[in-house]
Amino acid sequence: MVSFRTMWSLVVVVVVVAASLGSSGVHGRSVEGSSRMERLLSSGSSSSEPLSFLSQDQSVNKRQVFDQACKGIYDRAIFKKLDRVCEDCYNLYRKPYVATTCRQNCYANSVFRQCLDDLLLIDVVDEYISGVQTVGK
């Protein structure tokens, strides 16, 4: 009988806590960041279709670390580090066009900077920007 009362008390506590969290308006960071990312991606595109940039004559490989369009110094470690930001940003938003847009123009774009912000890498932004300048044009 004691274990039944303990279980019932535990269920009541869980329901009360869940109800108080649901009504307090707690939102995850990705909800806010997702809307910012959507606005950022839609503002740079002339088309309303989010994947319209994939129809260009260049095929995009999500797993490709080295971008042949980058005319700067080839450094595999820097490319992996920059690519990791885009990969983590993709994992945060789960939108394929976030990953591909993040890599455009040798990582020198506003989506890459937004990803640095959303991944809370603000304290090392200069290090990443230096890497972008090294591999960039």
Swiss-Prot record:
Localization per record: Secreted
Modified residues (Valine amide): V135
Transmembrane feature ranges: none
Taxonomy, superkingdom: Eukaryota
UniProt KW Signal keyword: yes
Cited Pfam families: Crust_neurohorm
Protein name, per record: Crustacean hyperglycemic hormones
Family statement drawn from the similarity comment of this UniProt entry: Belongs to the arthropod CHH/MIH/GIH/VIH hormone family.
Tissue expression per record: Produced by the medulla terminalis X-organ in the eyestalks and transported to the sinus gland where they are stored and released.
Gene Ontology molecular-function annotations: neuropeptide hormone activity
GO cellular component: extracellular region
Database matches in Gene3D superfamilies: Crustacean CHH/MIH/GIH neurohormone (1.10.2010.10)
Keywords: Amidation, Carbohydrate metabolism, Cleavage on pair of basic residues, D-amino acid, Disulfide bond, Glucose metabolism, Hormone, Neuropeptide, Pyrrolidone carboxylic acid, Secreted, Signal
Cysteines engaged in disulfide bonds, as pairs: C70-C106, C86-C102, C89-C115
D-phenylalanine: modified positions: F66
Signal peptide, first to last residue: 1-28
Cross-referenced InterPro entries: Crust_neurhormone_CS, Crust_neurohorm, Crust_neurohorm_sf, Hyperglycemic, Hyperglycemic1
Residue positions, PTM Pyrrolidone carboxylic acid: Q64
GO biological process: circadian rhythm; glucose metabolic process; neuropeptide signaling pathway
Function of the molecule: Hormone found in the sinus gland of isopods and decapods which controls the blood sugar level. Has a secretagogue action over the amylase released from the midgut gland. May act as a stress hormone and may be involved in the control of molting and reproduction.
